[in-house]
Amino acid sequence: SFSVNPAVDILQHRYMEKVAQNNRNFLNRV
């Protein structure tokens, strides 16, 4: 992420981790 605000970087990182986890759960269900 290219944000100047470190808080936004943290939020983006957490969001990407959540998305990745959701993708893994989806793949496991299929």
UniProtKB/Swiss-Prot annotation:
It comes from the Eukaryota. It is found in: Secreted. Keywords: Amidation, Hormone, Secreted. The modification Valine amide is found at residue 30. GO terms for molecular function: hormone activity. The keyword Phosphoprotein does not apply. SMART domains: CRF. InterPro entries: CRF (IPR000187). GO terms for cellular component: extracellular region. Regulation of fluid secretion. Prolonged ingestion of diuretic hormone 2 by M.sexta neonates results in reduced food consumption, slowed growth and reduced developmental rates. A high percentage of neonates fail to molt into second instar larvae and death usually follows shortly thereafter, suggesting the possible use of this insecticidal peptide in plant protection. Belongs to the sauvagine/corticotropin-releasing factor/urotensin I family. This is Diuretic hormone 2. It comes from Manduca sexta (Tobacco hawkmoth).
